[in-house]
Amino acid sequence: MAREPSFSIPARPRRRFPRRGGVEYDGQTLFRLVPGEPMSDEALADLLAETLAAGPYRYGDFLNLPMVLYLVRDQGTGDVFRASVRDGSIRLHVLPETDSAGLRRLYERLAERSGIEWEVDCQSSE
């Protein structure tokens, strides 16, 4: 059995509101969840959608992008973060107020639903 991954957040992005409108972020932290068995992006997108639909999540895919990108709110922890699928992994993108609990819970639900082990790595930049 693999060691449980840490979802400790080393750095948080900073939110900016440019004069021209919108919102931008300086810096990023993301957790890459890579399945222990190869899965296509389509299969990962289906797994993510099924896991989110099972709850306790409110989520939406609000942008017309060529890849899956959800804004997710864990109703149990109150954590809000983005989740995407790209290059054979599910990526959890930390927002300024995201805490580790919501990220960990989604990881646990994905692992339980898939029945496989996952490798988790954290990438952060300021």
Predicted regions and their residues:
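Short, intrinsically disordered low-complexity segments
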Residues: 54-96
